[in-house]
A protein has these predicted regions:
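Core subunits and conserved enzymes of cellular information-processing
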Residues: 2-217
Length: 217
C-alpha cells in the first residue's frame, strides 16, 4: 500500500481539475433535475429513504452510517489513495451544491415530463460520476460500494451499480408507486452505463488493486 506522502505527491493538478469538473456536473444535474422533478434513487440514497420510511431512522443518522460502512469496505479493498481522493471529491461536491443553491434554476422544470427528466438526469449523473471514478475517487457511498463489488466479483462497473440500485429500488416498491420506480429505473440504467463508459475511456478493462483505484497519467 502506498504511503500517505507518496499519495499526496502523486495528486496532480490535472487530477484535481477533473475531480472538480466531475463534481460540478454531478451536482448541477442533481440540483436542477433530480431534486426539482423528484426522481428517486437507488443505492445508498434510496436505502436511506427506505430505512426512514419503515424503521423511522432519520436521514441525518442513516446517511452517514451507511456511507461510513461503504467507505470502511473501500479502505479495506481499495486503499488509502481511494479514500483521500473520495474526500477531495466530497468537499468539492458540497461546495458546488452550495454554489448552485445560490442561483435560481438554470434548466427548465421537467416535472411534467418525467421520462425526459429521468434520461437527462441520468446523463448528468453518469458523466459526472464517471469522471470522478476515472480519477480513482467517489462521490459517495454508492460509488465506493459499487467499486468494492467490482473488485470482489470482477463485474463491469455498470453491472455493479445496477445491482445495488435494482436491489434497493425493488425493496422501495413496498412504499413507492411502481410508476415512479419505473422512471428511477430509467435514470439509474442510463447513469450506470455512462459511468462505466466514461470511466473506461482510453483504458483497457482493469480491476482496481488493493492500494488504489485507477491512476491517471
Amino acid at each position: 500500500m502506498k504511503s500517505f506522502k507518496k499519495i499526496v505527491s502523486d495528486f496532480t493538478m490535472k487530477r484535481l481539475f477533473w475531480l472538480v469538473l466531475g463534481t460540478a456536473i454531478l451536482s448541477f444535474g442533481i440540483h436542477n433535475i433530480h431534486q426539482r422533478a423528484a426522481i428517486t434513487e437507488g443505492g445508498v440514497i434510496g436505502l436511506v429513504l427506505l430505512m426512514n420510511h419503515w424503521l423511522g431512522i432519520p436521514a441525518s443518522i442513516a446517511s452517514p452510517l451507511l456511507d461510513f460502512i461503504c467507505y470502511a469496505l473501500a479502505f479495506k479493498f481499495l486503499g488509502l489513495d481511494f479514500i483521500l481522493t473520495a474526500a477531495v471529491a466530497s468537499v468539492s461536491l458540497a461546495g458546488f451544491y452550495r454554489l448552485w443553491e445560490s442561483f435560481p434554476p438554470m434548466l427548465p422544470d421537467l416535472t411534467p415530463w418525467p421520462l425526459a427528466a429521468a434520461l437527462l438526469g441520468g446523463v448528468f449523473v453518469g458523466i459526472g460520476v464517471g469522471i470522478i471514478v476515472r480519477q480513482g475517487g467517489s462521490s459517495g457511498g454508492d460509488d465506493a460500494l459499487a467499486l468494492v463489488i467490482r473488485q470482489l466479483t470482477g463485474w463491469k462497473l455498470a453491472r455493479s451499480y445496477l445491482f445495488t440500485d435494482l436491489v434497493v429500488l425493488g425493496a422501495s416498491l413496498s412504499y413507492i408507486p411502481a410508476r415512479r420506480i419505473a422512471f428511477s429505473l430509467v435514470t439509474v440504467t442510463v447513469s450506470s452505463l455512462l459511468i462505466d463508459w466514461v470511466q473506461g475511456l482510453g483504458y483497457d478493462e482493469k480491476i482496481h488493486g488493493n492500494d488504489a483505484a485507477k491512476e491517471v497519467e
